[in-house]
Amino acid sequence: MAAKDVKFGNDARSKMLRGVNVLADAVKVTLGPKGRNVVLDKSFGSPMITKDGVSVAREVELEDKFENMGAQMLKEVASKANDAAGDGTTTATVLAQSIVNEGLKAVAAGMNPMDLKRGIDKAVIGAVAELKKLSVPCSDSKSIAQVGTISANADKTVGTLIAEAMEKVGKEGVITVEEGSGLQDELDVVEGMQFDRGYLSPYFVNKPEARSVELDNPFILLSDKKISNIREMLPILESVAKAGKPLLIIAEDVEGEALATLVVNNMRGIVKVAAVKAPGFGDRRKAMLQDIAILTSGTVISEEMGLDLEKSTLEDMGQAKRVVITKDTTTIIDGTGNKSMISSRVSQINQERDEATSDYDKEKLQERVAKLAGGVAVIKVGAATEVEMKEKKARVEDALHATRAAVEEGVVAGGGVALIRVANRIVNLRGENEDQNVGIRVARRAMEAPLRQIVANAGEEPSVIANKVKAGEGNTGYNAATEVYGNMIDMGILDPTKVTRSALQYAASIAGLMITTECMITDLPKEEKPDLSGAGAGMGGMGGMM
């Protein structure tokens, strides 16, 4: 086992503090509308330019192992805030830095670290409760656009695009961000339910110019088995032909004689028909077929349920206003499903998603919700160069997370104002002893840090502006972009409550652990021994001396 280096007390804490400050100083220059960029060197390709706090934090590794331990613990703050709300990483880092610095000063002055931590925790619980009281719902497009704009670094086009996407696909819809091919940002919206399965034969195509199949008011047959025998299909084909409507078959597979007969019937105009494979695999396929059944008010013909394809009737068929099938995708538009059944199915999938443990499962369940409840929107980010593209895509993703958080828990005044107000509201909070009271004061002081940093990055004097904002009331704050005081919500400077809450909670949690550190242990660096393997090589010419 390798030898260890052990440090105690102030010696350990001062090293840890140095690491915390190096990382926080690198991250906090990005905060606010006038925050600067950070350039990150990459082992291959061009450097990455970013204003995203967590991207900067992830790059920091320090040579001194004790300092690095401090930096890595602070990195956890940014990472946790990012996982919880998708934004607020820089705010969380600034809060944690302030709590650690002020807390360690108090420890050096003889305060009890455990009581300090209890005081900090008490202050945060009080502050979170007050934050929730200040929060206002964020439901209209205007406030969603404002949140998106602030998070995307005051880029109004991004905020507007996100608001437009949310309006079209709903709060449950899936919005993804991709790299575009042009200079302009674009929004593509797929309405209805779309899945990644195309037509099984090009002979089904009835729109040759678009190489697609379009079926108006079709019946939809859903089966979880392979269909290869046309005899099973004959009764339903005859019923559909009599009804004079087209038919879409979604099954595990349609092959051989069955597929050939369908193609011939379609080409002769006896019955307008198309067939596609069911989406997904295994249990997920069964679940998605059930989703389509509920969306179209149909029944999945499944032998597990005791249903037989030969005995199926038009009552078992689903229906939709329109279906469009391309080589790769099938889109069902305006299914005739019962709204209350769809919403209870959405609730059921949401519950499954909350209980799911893997991110992949959560993502797939969220996609199913989106396909049932709204649709899918794709924001295509445009930029002139690859470096700009990466930076902009990261900003758009941040803005998207922030708007989702805003819709979930509402918004509070931005620009660090909400934290100043809640710090003021817990001014009368008291702990069980004086050391806990100091902890409460440390947390309240830290709540001013984001505003002070935003002001410092804008080149103004933090103390003067912080005191003016503290003297104000409600949503009155300082707009660092325009350098004016006013109502932050009226000026469109909003922060999602969830982002502010997560930043405060994670900062206090990890900073509290750092304050209570008394000993740090790390591996001693291994000494490189000189390579002596070639030392005797020069003696070869002495062989004749004997």
Swiss-Prot record:
Signal sequence segment: none
Similarity comment: family membership: Belongs to the chaperonin (HSP60) family.
Localization annotation: Cytoplasm
Annotated stretches, region: Disordered: 526-546
Source species: Wigglesworthia glossinidia brevipalpis
The UniProt record lists the keyword Isomerase: yes
Reactions that this protein is recorded to catalyse: ATP + H2O + a folded polypeptide = ADP + phosphate + an unfolded polypeptide
Protein name per the record: Chaperonin GroEL
Single GO BP term: protein refolding
Binding-site residues, ATP: 30-33, 51, 87-91, 415, 479-481, 495
Organism placement in taxonomy: Bacteria, Pseudomonadati, Pseudomonadota, Gammaproteobacteria, Enterobacterales
MF term (GO), any: ATP binding
